[in-house]
UniProtKB/Swiss-Prot annotation:
The gene is clpX. The keyword Chaperone applies. PROSITE patterns: CLPX_ZB. Belongs to the ClpX chaperone family. One of its GO terms (biological process) is cell division. Component of the ClpX-ClpP complex. Forms a hexameric ring that, in the presence of ATP, binds to fourteen ClpP subunits assembled into a disk-like structure with a central cavity, resembling the structure of eukaryotic proteasomes. It holds the Pfam family AAA_2. The lineage of its organism: Bacteria, Pseudomonadati, Pseudomonadota, Gammaproteobacteria, Vibrionales. One of its GO terms (cellular component) is HslUV protease complex. NCBIfam families: clpX, PRK05342.1. ATP binds at residues 122-129. HAMAP family: ClpX. It comes from Vibrio cholerae serotype O1 (strain ATCC 39315 / El Tor Inaba N16961). This is ATP-dependent Clp protease ATP-binding subunit ClpX.
Length: 426
């Protein structure tokens, strides 16, 4: 190796042994035994190694795909109830990733299609949580998009391609990683067209968005600007194959129960052959959702082509009071456990009495916000205590009972000196 160092008085001008740049042309020059390497060459080496690893990773991952039963068990740890939806999701997700890891065709040459998922359920029933938990279990990139912000290309709002850009951002613009990701599009029911008949006026945030999403969900090669695309317009666009991305669309579909009820209630036949139904034979929202058919979704405002791209439909049930109590204390990241952990950082125990849990669940049921409303109730109840506690000394325990939830009294503070008093500051 030729020595490119030059004597300059008492100091020696050093050069990178790999690219030949001097120490003044680079930010850092690392010295080894008679060898030097600059920071730019180190970055280049890292890129080369990363590319090598990327080619090896898919082979390693193929052995790690959990079975539908294992996926369901993992969902049970975080999501209460929704047994049918969990089973449907577990099978659909397993089949999707099995298809990716074994190629799109079988040994007999049979092409395997993609099964995207439609989640139908009332607000706060766990649609988003199910999608997030699946992505975390499979260790794949996950992004959420709000369908209400999407518009057709050329109009004010987000283009559908922005969804893929968000997914790329989650995995540092690694295209191969993004192509194995999961995209959850929330509020999908809000882009339904206003009537069953095609409109002659432009519907840029309804049917127009459904049309724009068609190819993306089914599978296309989307051109996405690279990181800092506007700063470096000369860079080539990244090509992302969306046929490998799993799309999960979710929505509350308010009013869909009326559409289903109307179809189910329509009796067939006349005379003795008529299907007679009692007026009192009314069904719950959850029972009606389980009877949903593609024709109901078309009547609701989704175009037939869009419904066809979402062949797997999972319906979620309304959460009753017992389920809300379970959600408060049973999952691994249950809200009561989260707040107990927060209080533990102050060296204080937090206890929720049984009657308090029932009162919280009853309050959430009245608000009709499902599990989503539980956190806001707890925040309001614990606000004063969390405000005062860091400034107080010798508090060892905080007890919450029904009267605290109903606003009739303040939380009970138990001091390490075995004294107890109400937390209300008079």
């Amino acid at each position: 190796m030729t020595d490119k160092s030059k004597e300059g008085g008492s100091s020696k001008l050093l050069y990178c042994s790999f690219c030949g740049k001097s120490q003044h042309e680079v930010r850092k020059l690392i010295a080894g035994p008679s060898v030097y390497i600059c920071d730019e060459c180190v970055d280049l080496c890292n890129d080369i190694i990363r590319e090598e690893i990327k080619d090896v990773l898919p082979k390693k991952e193929s052995a790690a795909l959990p079975t539908p039963r294992k996926i369901r068990e993992h969902l049970d740890d975080y999501v209460i109830g929704q047994e049918h939806a969990k089973k449907v999701l577990a099978v659909a997700v397993y089949n999707h990733y099995k298809r990716l890891r074994n190629g799109d065709t079988t040994s007999e040459g049979v092409e395997l299609g993609k099964s995207n998922i439609l989640l139908i359920g009332p607000t706060g029933s766990g649609k988003t949580l199910l999608a997030e938990t699946l992505a975390r279990l499979l260790d794949v990139p996950f992004t959420m998009a709000d369908a209400t912000t999407l518009t057709e290309a050329g109009y004010v709002g987000e283009d559908v391609e922005n969804i893929i850009q968000k997914l790329l951002q989650k995995c540092d613009y690694d295209v191969a990683k993004a192509e194995r990701g999961i995209v959850y599009i929330d509020e999908i029911d809000k882009i339904s067209r206003k009537s069953e008949n095609p409109s002659i006026t432009r519907d840029v945030s309804g049917e127009g968005v459904q049309q724009a999403l068609l190819k993306l969900i089914e599978g296309t090669v989307a051109s996405v600007p690279p990181q800092g695309g506007r700063k470096h317009p000369q860079q080539e666009f990244l090509q992302v194959d969306t046929s490998k991305i799993l799309f999960i669309c979710g929505g509350a579909f308010a009013g869909l129960d009326k559409v289903i009820e109307q179809r189910v209630a329509t009796g067939t036949g006349i005379g003795f052959g008529a299907d007679v139904r009692s007026k009192d034979n009314s069904k719950t929202l959850s029972e009606l959702f389980t009877q949903v058919e593609p024709e109901d979704l078309v009547k609701y405002g989704l175009i037939p082509e869009f419904i066809g791209r979402l062949p797997v439909t999972a319906t979620l049930t309304e959460l009753d009071e017992a389920a809300l109590i379970q959600i408060l204390c049973e999952p691994k990241n249950a809200l009561t456990k989260q707040y107990a952990a927060l209080f533990e950082l102050e060296n204080v125990d937090l206890e929720f009495r049984e009657d308090a849990l029932k009162a919280i669940a009853a309050k959430a049921m009245k608000r009709k916000t499902g599990a989503r409303g539980l956190r806001s109730i707890l925040e309001a109840v614990l606000l004063e205590t969390m405000y005062e506690l860091p400034s107080m000394e010798e508090v060892s325990k905080v007890v919450i009972d029904e009267s605290v939830i109903n606003g009739e009294s303040a939380p009970l503070l138990i001091y390490s000196a075995n004294e107890s008093q109400a937390a209300g500051a008079e």
